[in-house]
Amino acid sequence: MFVPCGESAPDLAGFTLLMPAVSVGNVGQLAMDLIISTLNMSKIGYFYTDCLVPMVGNNPYATTEGNSTELSINAEVYSLPSRKLVALQLRSIFIKYKSKPFCEKLLSWVKSSGCARVIVLSSSHSYQRNDLQLRSTPFRYLLTPSMQKSVQNKIKSLNWEEMEKSRCIPEIDDSEFCIRIPGGGITKTLYDESCSKEIQMAVLLKFVSEGDNIPDALGLVEYLNEWLQILKPLSDDPTVSASRWKIPSSWRLLFGSGLPPALF
C-alpha cells in the first residue's frame, strides 16, 4: 500500500501519524495542508490504493516556480523526522464500499511501520448537535482505550470536552447510546477499528457547516497545537495565532480562478 519515494522505506518507529478524515467542509484536509505547509514537511511516499477516486495535480505546497510542476496524487505521506511527525494527506473521496478496506489497510501499515500513535483531524455536522453541544465549545475529542492510558492526564489538563454518546437511532427514544459522528466520513470506522486492534488513536473534531471552512481549519490546528505544541504559543490574540500558520500556495484557487476579463 505504501510506496516510498526513495529506494527503501523510511524508519517511522515511534512517530506520530497525523491524518484527516474526508469529512464535512473538508476541515481535516485543510488543517493538514496548514500543518504540512507550515512545518515544510518533506514528501516521503504515497499510498497506492484502489479505494480512493484517482486524481493528479500540481504540487499544492509549491514555494518556487521550479517545484510547482511536481505532481501530487490522492494520498501522499510527508514527514518531519526532527519532531517525529508523519502526515498523511488525502485529496479525494472514497469509492463506494471501499472506505472500510482502506481503514483496515491503513491501520495494518500503521502497525507494520511502528508508528506510536495516530491523530485524526475531522469534522461533524453542526446542525446535528444536541442541546448540550450547542451550549458548549464546538471542539470534541475521542481516545481509544490504549491511547487513554498514555495521554489521559495531559488531555484532562487541557479541559477538553470528550465527544458525547447519543442515541444510535435518534428517531427512536429507547434506542441504545453510542458514538455518532454525522458527516465525519471514515472517522467512526477508523476509531472502531483502532479500538479493536488496540491502536493508540485520538480523534480531534469540530462541529461545522459547509461553506468557507478556512477559519474552521485554523481553529482545528490551534486545537491540536494546544496538545502537541507544533508551534509555540506567542499570544492570546487569536488573530496573531492564526497568522503563524503558513497558507499553502494551492489555496489561492480554493474557490476557483478569478473572473475572466473578457466578461467585462
UniProtKB/Swiss-Prot annotation:
The modification Phosphothreonine is found at T137. SUPFAM superfamilies: Cgl1923-like. Chaperone protein which promotes assembly of the 20S proteasome as part of a heterodimer with PSMG1. The PSMG1-PSMG2 heterodimer binds to the PSMA5 and PSMA7 proteasome subunits, promotes assembly of the proteasome alpha subunits into the heteroheptameric alpha ring and prevents alpha ring dimerization. Keywords: Chaperone, Nucleus, Phosphoprotein. The lineage of its organism: Eukaryota, Metazoa, Chordata, Craniata, Vertebrata. Widely expressed with highest levels in lung, brain and colon. Moderately expressed in muscle, stomach, spleen and heart. Weakly expressed in small intestine, pancreas and liver. Highly expressed in hepatocellular carcinomas with low levels in surrounding liver tissue. Degraded by the proteasome upon completion of 20S proteasome maturation. Transmembrane segments: none annotated. The gene is PSMG2. Forms a heterodimer with PSMG1. The PSMG1-PSMG2 heterodimer interacts directly with the PSMA5 and PSMA7 proteasome alpha subunits. It is linked to Proteasome-associated autoinflammatory syndrome 4: An autosomal recessive, autoinflammatory disorder characterized by panniculitis and erythematous skin lesions apparent in early infancy. Additional features include hepatosplenomegaly, lymphadenopathy, autoimmune hemolytic anemia, fever, generalized lipodystrophy, myositis, joint contractures, and mild motor and speech delay. It is found in: Nucleus. Signal peptide: none annotated. Its main location: nucleus. One of its GO terms (molecular function) is molecular adaptor activity. Belongs to the PSMG2 family. This is Proteasome assembly chaperone 2. It comes from the Eukaryota. One of its GO terms (cellular component) is cytosol. GO terms for biological process: chaperone-mediated protein complex assembly; mitotic spindle assembly checkpoint signaling; negative regulation of apoptotic process; proteasome assembly.
